[in-house]
Amino acid sequence: MKNIKCLSVVFALCLVAASFGGAVSADSDASPLSGLPGGAGKPVVMVKYGNSKPDRPHYNLNQADLFYVEEVEWGLTRIAAMFNTKFPSVVGPTRSARISDLEILEQFTSPGIAYSGANDVLLKAIRKSQSISLSPSDRSSFYYRNLSKVAPYNQLLRLSSMMEKETKVGPIKDVGLTFDRNVPAGGVAAKTFSASWPSSKVSGTWGGKSWTVSFDGSLHRDAVSKALLTPKTVVLQFVERKESKYGDRFGGKTPLLKSVGAGRAIVLRNGQSFDGSWSRPTSESGTTFSFANSQIAFDVGQVMIVFVDGGVKKPPFTVK
């Protein structure tokens, strides 16, 4: 009886603690990229998606733990999607890698990068990096073409089958992000956001539980499930945009988006905006996002990070 009474007291104390808003953080085995369960210790793979109109709809982008929207040549954007907790059966359409991808990947240990190809100069940089190249030249049996579309917008990857046999990609590590379902204090109500480039636009609307994302004014619907793209947290990360020595075969210059450094960051979660900062001191370190002089936690779930040019007086973005 004494043991039963003691257990009852402990249970009651737990209920009292919970009623006072104890942290509802990510599970101990959670992904360092989303806070979702099951990612700790598993491999991490970046998949390069095209993001022009002919590339869409995307396959299983909504299952990525985190994805970046990056400017490329001609004012277009591409998507660098990080998969860790789940490796869907099919992803894509896969497109070519860019120099900004390598700087993102330097914070991991032997991460995979799945992409359709790259020019000779960038291919040499990929081979010299610590990233594990998973292009069709490296893993040809897992790539195929969707014959209902034309190249280069139709190359798909059987990601889950590839990862079942993959031995070179390293396990994910902590990259500086924190997750908590409790809403931080000090936010300002925000129901919509947008960021734009000369030939591309991303926008979103708060839907009560997550953000609903559109590209070029059209709601994103998955090619497989038809589900909407609904990240829990959206970050507008203002980065240095530099000209690089890389470009496409048509003469377009590839911008280098510096994810190492520091700058402004607007974190959007739970229908609120937190105008703060980001810091990544070295290429090997992760990124810390802060608000009101403290690290800010993301909501548990998918994260979308949009690289915005921080070097112009009026960056093309809105938060309302």
What role is predicted for each listed range?
Residues 1-10:
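Bacterial N-terminal signal peptides that target proteins for export
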Residues 10-19:
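Bacterial N-terminal signal peptides
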Residues 18-30:
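Sec-dependent signal peptide cleavage junction
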Residues 27-68, 73-320:
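A surface/extracellular/periplasmic glyco- and lipid-processing/surface-interacting theme
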